[in-house]
């Protein structure tokens, strides 16, 4: 759907949208890119949070006057549009032999690094070692893949976190806080 653009950071990446994807719904979609870090292949997952349209010709004061009179200028309207998205990275996995282990985005991938959409098959592959510990809370908001979450008890062992964690659910009246709380409680049932 696109490539890593500039400027990007370890917390938010610029996404230069390919011409073949400009008419797709991208906001809310889950993306994936591969990059090298410390000599190993890493795979980063993130959600596309925004898409912006720029056309530098339409921003020119002289062209704005012409556009105000004509509505569009065939030589530059639409043809010179560029679409840039923003992607917030939420999980990173390092390739470790035939498995994947959790990691972090400790470097910024090179511009031009391809970004593709994620489906359930990709998530199942990355999370295969943790299959028995996952709870699917529904779908990724604004997308189609199932949303995998870990809900660990406070004890030790493979299903335990070894310490207590707290969770807060906040939102406006009618936003689904109670429904979300019920779904999370099901994970512990």
Where are these regions (language model features)?
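Long, basic/Gly/Ser/Thr-rich N-terminal segments
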Residues: 1-128
């Amino acid at each position: 759907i696109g490539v890593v653009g500039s400027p990007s950071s370890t917390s938010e990446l610029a996404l230069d949208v390919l011409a073949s994807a400009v008419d797709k719904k991208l906001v809310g979609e889950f993306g994936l890119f591969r990059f090298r870090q410390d000599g190993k292949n890493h795979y980063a997952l993130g959600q596309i949070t925004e898409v912006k349209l720029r056309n530098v010709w339409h921003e020119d004061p002289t062209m704005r006057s012409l556009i105000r009179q004509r509505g569009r200028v065939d030589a530059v309207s639409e043809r010179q549009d560029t679409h840039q998205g923003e992607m917030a990275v939420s999980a990173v996995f390092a390739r470790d032999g035939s498995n994947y282990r959790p990691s972090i985005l400790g470097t910024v991938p090179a511009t031009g690094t391809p970004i593709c959409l994620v489906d359930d098959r990709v998530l199942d592959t990355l999370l295969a070692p943790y299959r028995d510990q996952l709870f699917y809370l529904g779908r990724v908001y604004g997308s189609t893949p199932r949303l995998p979450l870990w809900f660990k008890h406070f004890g030790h062992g493979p299903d335990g976190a070894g310490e207590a964690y707290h969770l807060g659910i906040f939102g406006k009246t009618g936003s689904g806080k109670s429904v979300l709380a019920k779904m999370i409680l099901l994970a512990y049932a």
